[in-house]
């Protein structure tokens, strides 16, 4: 029955200019423009998902739909793509933002870590009215961006921020980071050249076929196209952002956490190569009064591939002010 309900959930893919960059937004629910009167009543809250890297927004659709259903269709759930992680298809239009002036100014180094944070701020200012409360959900490096969005724009009406598998410190020292750092920082240009040679001349229909085969082998059902994952432009930007993560995300920003602690919930994995249990233990020690949880369900860092329903259930319980079932 749940799957039948989720099939009926309206999901749309839209493209906007944000900080001078074409940006994909996936919207779950009947609301398209929160500034305009529509056939449905204006929601009081918006659930806004900031993905990880290379967390292409299409991967988060099952999670968004599950969360939308668990919240009884009361609030829209939106997923923003990172700057440079999507290419607008030829059959799609780049739409005007409700508050266009917020998106007119280009962002310096928009594909880098700082630029990506400013990119999210520009979108929220242009698309979300001040009387709509925000429920921010960050995943992986999206948690780092979430914290810094809150720090830089204090007037944002953030009700809650849920930080899933938070990569907010010592990324290059983590088990995965020790491998990824030399690859992303020293061999990034080799990846650029390889992806350009392999995929630039490749027709879109062939890319779609390759992705369908790969997703089929991984038993992943995609509801929206994912050809961006084989676009050299997008791959290069994902690698560039990753290289900056390894270099810049080092010391945990305790000042931000202290300032917003009552609004924050952290969820760590037991076998997470990006934020190991030691990081969880340090957080619990330094912030004993915080809402900091360690997963007991075996949910992996890349939960969007197989555990969307389980993760959505936990987040829905948080939103409804119930302690999560570990």
From Swiss-Prot:
Keywords: Endoplasmic reticulum, Hydrolase, Lipid droplet
Protein name: Lipid droplet-associated hydrolase
Chief place where the protein resides: other
Active site: 140 (nucleophile), 272 (charge relay system), 301 (charge relay system)
UniProt source species: Mus musculus
Coiled-coil spans in chain: none
Subcellular localization, as worded in the UniProt entry: Lipid droplet; Endoplasmic reticulum
Documented EC number(s): 3.1.1.13
């Amino acid at each position: 029955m749940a799957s039948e309900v989720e099939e009926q959930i309206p999901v749309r893919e839209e493209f906007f200019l944000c900080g001078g960059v074409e940006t994909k937004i996936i919207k779950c629910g009947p609301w398209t423009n929160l500034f305009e009167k529509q056939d449905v009543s204006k929601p009081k809250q918006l659930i806004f998902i900031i993905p990880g890297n290379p967390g292409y927004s299409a991967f988060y659709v099952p999670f968004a739909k599950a969360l939308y259903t668990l919240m009884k269709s009361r609030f829209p759930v939106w997923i923003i793509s990172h700057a440079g992680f999507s290419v607008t298809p030829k059959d799609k239009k780049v739409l005007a933002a409700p508050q266009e002036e917020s998106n007119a100014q280009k962002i310096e180094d928009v594909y880098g870590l700082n630029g990506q944070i400013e990119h999210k701020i520009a979108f929220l200012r242009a698309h979300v009215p001040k009387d709509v409360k925000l429920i921010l959900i960050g995943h992986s490096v999206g948690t780092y961006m979430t914290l810094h969005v809150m720090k830089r724009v204090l007037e944002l009406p953030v009700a809650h921020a849920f930080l899933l598998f938070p990569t907010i410190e010592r990324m290059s020292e983590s088990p995965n980071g020790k491998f990824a750092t030399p690859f992303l920082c020293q061999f990034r240009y080799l990846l650029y050249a390889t992806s350009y040679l392999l995929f630039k001349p490749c027709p879109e229909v062939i890319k779609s076929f390759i992705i369908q085969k790969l997703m089929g082998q991984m038993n992943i059902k995609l509801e929206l196209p994912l050809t961006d994952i084989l676009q050299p432009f997008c791959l290069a930007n994902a690698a560039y952002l990753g290289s900056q993560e390894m270099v810049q995300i080092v010391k945990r920003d305790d000042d931000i956490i202290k300032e917003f602690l009552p609004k924050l919930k952290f969820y760590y994995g037991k076998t997470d190569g990006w934020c190991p249990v030691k990081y969880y233990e340090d957080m619990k020690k330094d912030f004993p009064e915080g809402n900091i949880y360690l997963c007991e369900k075996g949910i992996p860092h890349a939960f969007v591939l197989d555990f969307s329903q389980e993760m959505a259930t936990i987040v829905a319980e948080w939103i409804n002010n119930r302690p999560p079932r570990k």
